[in-house]
């Protein structure tokens, strides 16, 4: 009985103390899975924009002519705020 209790407690601690990457959102994780980098405002000259990470962050990935890799466009839930119309 004590062995079962000990195993149950160890399993509980393993579940509760498991490493969790909570700092990345789903779009940032998808960008990293495509070998991309989230950059602020603009991508470098040798990079293509393959999506959006956050408000002003863009998912950028280096393009290589010799090794083309298809990249799906990453759509973000964020929409730019409407600009006020001047009357």
From Swiss-Prot:
It is found in: Secreted. Disulfide bonds join 31-59, 38-53, 43-60. InterPro entries: Beta/alpha-defensin_C. Keywords: Disulfide bond, Glycoprotein, Secreted, Signal. Residues 1-22 form the signal peptide. The keyword DNA damage does not apply. The keyword Glycoprotein applies. PANTHER family: BETA-DEFENSIN (PTHR20515), BETA-DEFENSIN 109B-RELATED (PTHR20515:SF3). Has antibacterial activity. This is Beta-defensin 109D. The lineage of its organism: Eukaryota, Metazoa, Chordata, Craniata, Vertebrata.
């Amino acid at each position: 009985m004590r062995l079962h209790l000990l195993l149950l407690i160890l399993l509980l601690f393993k579940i509760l103390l498991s490493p969790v990457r909570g700092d990345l959102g789903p779009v940032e994780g998808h960008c990293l899975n495509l070998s991309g980098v989230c950059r602020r405002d603009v991508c470098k000259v040798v990079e293509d924009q393959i999506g959006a990470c956050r408000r002003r962050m863009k998912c950028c990935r280096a393009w290589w002519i010799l090794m083309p890799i298809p990249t799906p466009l990453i759509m973000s839930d964020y929409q730019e705020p409407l600009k006020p119309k001047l009357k």
